């Protein structure tokens, strides 16, 4: 695993700028957030393809839908906590229901805002958006996967919600020799003792936990489930059948997210599942690393849960 440290938001907007130089139909929309979403270079170089809406997320989604309806390839970018709360009706009606080709980039997702607290965390986004017919959801795990995702999304005809964090993250993938397909999981480690399924920035921790478990004689399968909707049902069922136990890891509420998707998928042929996520409480204050450690989302916490799980 490579040691490069690049923020997924930066990888996303850098790739978008590269593509937009060649495709004048690509438009970036934001809400007084060009700094936090790293769209400053895009705005300076391609002002005719950039729309600044100010702090008006509802308007931004509506404007984006209108631009998409006129044939533009629109990426509306801003803090995840606001796009899946303040502008939720517009996302539901103008994007999902109307099937307008708009991609939402929600930055600083999950607990990335750290000490800013519960008002700025987005721990409900998967649970809410996956109930909207026609809405796709992706949580890329590193800069390389994010770059592949942007290239795929430019010509993808349906609305997609992409959630990334804030800080630079280690590469999960050592090079570009891997596929990224919506609806397909990638197997990072294979094993038969249990399966760990993760999405977004928790994938790195799941992979590291898998390596730690190997040192203890436990062969864990680790799945990168960055495509949340559509989800790889076949990979989940195969993991249940072949390993008999599943742990899910998500920077999201334990309700309605990745863990719930796995349990729902296996409802007719269930196996024991442990969901590592945020419980039904306002998140403790701290930076994202401290919060991950507190709730067992880091590699040490995942490894501990796995060791306890296989002993039962």
Swiss-Prot record:
Pathway: Carbohydrate metabolism. It catalyses: apulose 4-phosphate + D-glyceraldehyde 3-phosphate = D-xylulose 5-phosphate + dihydroxyacetone phosphate. Pfam families: Transket_pyr, Transketolase_C. Its cofactor is thiamine diphosphate. InterPro entries: PDH/Transketolase, THDP-binding, Transketo_C/PFOR_II, Transketolase-like_Pyr-bd, Transketolase_C. It is an enzyme of class 2 (transferase). CDD domains: TPP_PYR_DXS_TK_like (cd07033). It comes from the Bacteria. GO terms for molecular function: transferase activity. Transmembrane segments: none annotated. Its EC number is 2.2.1.13. Keywords: Carbohydrate metabolism, Thiamine pyrophosphate, Transferase. Belongs to the transketolase family. Probable heterodimer composed of AptA and AptB. Involved in catabolism of D-apiose. Catalyzes the transfer of the glycolaldehyde group from apulose-4-phosphate to D-glyceraldehyde 3-phosphate, generating dihydroxyacetone phosphate and D-xylulose-5-phosphate. This is Apulose-4-phosphate transketolase subunit B. It comes from Phocaeicola vulgatus (strain ATCC 8482 / DSM 1447 / JCM 5826 / CCUG 4940 / NBRC 14291 / NCTC 11154) (Bacteroides vulgatus).
């Amino acid at each position: 695993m490579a040691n490069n440290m690049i923020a997924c938001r930066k990888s996303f907007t850098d790739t978008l700028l590269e593509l937009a130089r060649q495709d004048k139909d690509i438009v970036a929309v934001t809400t007084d957030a060009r700094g936090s979403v790293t769209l400053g270079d895009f705005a300076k170089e391609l002002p005719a393809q950039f729309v600044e809406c100010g702090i008006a997320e509802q308007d931004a989604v509506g404007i984006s839908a209108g631009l998409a309806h006129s044939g533009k390839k629109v990426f509306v970018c801003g803090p995840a906590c606001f796009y899946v709360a303040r502008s939720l009706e517009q996302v539901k009606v103008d994007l999902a229901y109307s099937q307008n080709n708009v991609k939402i980039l929600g930055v600083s997702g999950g607990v990335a805002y750290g000490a800013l607290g519960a008002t700025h965390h987005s721990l409900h986004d998967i649970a809410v958006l996956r109930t909207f017919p026609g809405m796709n959801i992706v949580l890329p795990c590193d800069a390389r996967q994010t770059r592949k995702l942007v290239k795929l999304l430019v010509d993808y005809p349906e609305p997609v919600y992409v959630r990334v964090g804030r800080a630079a993250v280690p590469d999960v993938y050592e090079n570009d020799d891997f596929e990224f397909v919506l609806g397909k999981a990638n197997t990072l480690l294979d094993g038969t003792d249990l399966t760990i399924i993760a999405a977004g920035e928790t994938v790195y921790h799941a992979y590291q936990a898998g390596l730690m478990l190997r040192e203890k004689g436990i062969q864990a399968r680790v799945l990168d489930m960055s495509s949340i909707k559509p989800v790889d049902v076949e990979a989940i069922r195969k993991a249940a059948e072949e390993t008999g136990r599943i742990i899910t890891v998500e920077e999201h509420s334990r309700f309605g997210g990745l863990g719930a998707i796995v349990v729902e998928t296996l409802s007719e042929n269930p196996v024991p599942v442990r969901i590592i996520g945020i419980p039904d409480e306002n998140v403790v204050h701290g930076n994202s690393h401290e919060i991950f450690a507190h709730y067992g989302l880091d590699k040490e916490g995942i490894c501990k849960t796995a060791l306890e799980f296989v002993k039962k």
